[in-house]
Amino acid sequence: MGQAPGTHWYHAHKHGSTAINVANGMTGVFVIEGGYDDALNDFYGKGWTRTQPVLVINQIGVTPNLERGGGGRTDKGPNFSVNGRIRPVMAMAPGEVKLWRIANTSGRAGMFLTGIFAAGPQGPCYGAAAGFQWKQTAQDGVQLIDANYQASRNPTLTMMAGNRVDLLVMAPATPGTYSVCVQNMVDPSDLATQQKTTLFSVKVAGTPASGAAAQFIGTAPPFPAFLAD
């Protein structure tokens, strides 16, 4: 077997220019299918995984030498793009489950997923929790065993540069537009000073999902033999 199944990423690798190229967005994601996808498609429907969103995160506005000038600054850089767009909008039906394959391909910045929120008086990320549910199924291209999948309910996630996460995400029953909110971080101590920012929005509208489309798969996809050791 060559590369193991999972969500993987790539970047330009010209020696001497790699950091500059990655900072300028020369990155991408590729998915290798295997038994993991087969199990999800058996539950959600033939070809379902091929219709699910792949979210490639890039940091925007960094300088090629990655320096931040001035003493006493607390910001860790600018916001992020998602598939080359700033704060795009994803559509979901009420109660629908989607598989989000998220890859942080930033040149430097980490990304702390704080949650999914309705708008509040202080801004899009400072309202009430929106009622989304999510369960993690894979990390860095490696699927989780069932015990970890079962224990993973609405986890907060830290994605440093190069990290990938697969999440099954269930939309709330209430229609509306909600913000997926993150904090830009390099070190955990940054979280005390970094404001929440909208990574992208989810518009929940239309006919409510039903059947398997509105359920989490009961058990994680079977763990492959090549990972058993």
Residues of each region from the PLM?
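Extracytoplasmic/periplasmic ligand-capture domains
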Residues: 1-2, 167
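Hydrophobic or amphipathic alpha-helical targeting/insertion segments
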Residues: 2-39
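Short alpha-helical segments and helix-capping/turn motifs at coil-helix boundaries
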Residues: 14-16, 35-42, 85-87, 97, ...
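Beta-sandwich strand segments
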Residues: 19-24, 42, 189-196
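Extracytoplasmic/periplasmic copper-protein system
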Residues: 27-50, 199, 203-218
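Histidine- and aromatic-rich segments of cupredoxin/plastocyanin-like copper-binding domains
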Residues: 56-228
